Amino acid sequence: LEVLKDANKLDPEVKNFINANNKITEDYFQDVKNLQKNLFQEIKSKIKLNDTTLKFKDKKYYYWAKTEAKGNYGKRIRQLIDGSKPEEIYFDGDLEKKNYGSEYFGVGSVSISHCDNFMAYSLDLKGSEYYTIYLRDLRTGKNEKDIIKNTSGGITWSLDSKSFFYSKLDKFHRPRQIFKHTIGTSIKDDKLIFEEKDETFTCGIGLTSDEKFFIISTSDHITTEDYFFPSDANEIKPVLFKQRKKDVRYSIDSWKGYFYIHT
């Protein structure tokens, strides 16, 4: 990232090599420069720079997103279904980038608590793909002291909105541990609820469609294994759903008292 900001930091031999190859490429494509410009404009003209997604319902709110030609990161918006209050921009990507003052700005997840009062969001401000999780009280618009570094970026709220789950990255950039963080407590007290022992596997956590269970999914490129535990459990003890079998991928969900498995 440093050499992208300042090419003079490159080793002179490497810099000369890159410049020489760039010159070869430029000369080779000299005859089609106008075609390149025309293709770029044609592709750009097919992209709707000012666009709004369809609204979807979640509990008391409608949620949707909006992109604008003048911005790069878009806005996330919500409004009470009964229309009693005006639209609320709860995450403005371009404004957040400006406020953080970072040249690089990568958004991981933006997740609203089930009580609708809190927003947990993850950002990569260095281009390292290590995401830091921040917590904001949407009633005040102010961030809480809860800051969690070196995560995969994923965030899953507990149903009582008092805590959320996240996965930490190991030294090889793999998410192999899932933690539970309780709002207002020290990060040092976060509880490890699952650890994948196989270094070739990664893990993540999500909520089933009926919100009855949390599912911990582990996988490599060709094999998966899922665990589950009740979403209202006081003590978390993940239960293996089906033992992993090489070259077999499956996922599970629950609805109206049944588990559904897709293999």
Which sequence ranges carry the predicted segments?
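Beta-propeller folds
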Residues: 1-263
